[in-house]
Structures are given as C-alpha cells and as structure tokens.
Swiss-Prot record:
Coiled coil: none annotated. The lineage of its organism: Bacteria, Bacillati, Mycoplasmatota, Mollicutes, Entomoplasmatales. One of its GO terms (biological process) is translation. InterPro entries: Ribosomal_bL19, Ribosomal_bL19_CS, Ribosomal_bL19_sf, Translation_prot_SH3-like_sf. It comes from the Bacteria. This is Large ribosomal subunit protein bL19. It comes from Mesoplasma florum (strain ATCC 33453 / NBRC 100688 / NCTC 11704 / L1) (Acholeplasma florum).
Length: 128
C-alpha cells in the first residue's frame, strides 16, 4: 500500500508532466534560434520575435531555460527564456553552430569577425 507522501509526490509529478511542452526542437549552445513570445498589450496579445545566439542552456524538466543573445541597434541584448512557460509561443532553429563549450560566455568579449561561430550545414538525413 502506498503511503500518503508517495501519492502526493506522484500527483505532483503528474501535474508537472501535464505542463511540459513537447513541441520544442533539440538545440544546444552555439545555435541561432528564433523565440516567439506572447506580449500582452491591454486586452490583446501580440507575438514578438526574439532571434539570437544561444549562449547557455540550464535546468531540466519544467525549469529548463535558455539565454539568447542578439544585437539590437548596436547594443547586445541577452534575454532568459523559461521554455516551458505559457508566454513562449514557438521556438525554431535558424542555424546550427559548432562550439566546444556548453556555456559560451567568452563570446561577450569578442567583436566583429572574432565573434563568428562555425556553422554546421544540414545533411540529407537532417532534412528528412
């Protein structure tokens, strides 16, 4: 017979698994992604796109989040997105990059051509 603590733990995990998204693509640091975010203005919602380089992924399960960095009007902007949040509408991969680190904070100090990341070109198997 299951104890009361076990039943509450099971129900907690059932609620969390209900809230997990299953439409997220598989991406890592160095990839360029496009995140569509729902913005509430008054009574209406609109979609705002944030496209940039993934410099960090963190957490697992419901706490999975990603830090995306982009150039906006000559200033670099970094934004953290909890990916299982209801304000995230869609995440798409623009291009894949090859880096040797999980957290590419060193990209903050680089500028110009030094800040480029080697692109991984899709193969025929990836297109299928």
């Amino acid at each position: 017979m299951a104890s009361k603590a076990t039943k509450t733990t099971q129900s907690k995990y059932a609620i969390i698994n209900n809230q997990l998204r299953n439409d997220l693509p598989d991406f890592t640091s160095g990839d360029t992604i496009k995140v569509d975010v729902k913005i509430k203005e008054g009574e209406k919602f609109r979609i705002q796109t944030f496209e940039g380089l993934v410099i960090k992924t963190q957490g697992s399960g419901i706490t999975y989040s990603v830090v995306v960095r982009k150039l906006s009007n000559g200033v670099f902007v970094e934004r953290t997105f909890p990916l299982h949040s209801p304000i995230i509408d869609k995440v798409t991969i623009v291009k894949r990059g090859r880096v040797r680190r999980a957290r590419i904070y060193y990209i903050r100090k680089l500028s110009g051509k030094a800040a480029r990341i080697k692109e991984i070109l899709p193969t025929k198997a990836d297109k299928k």
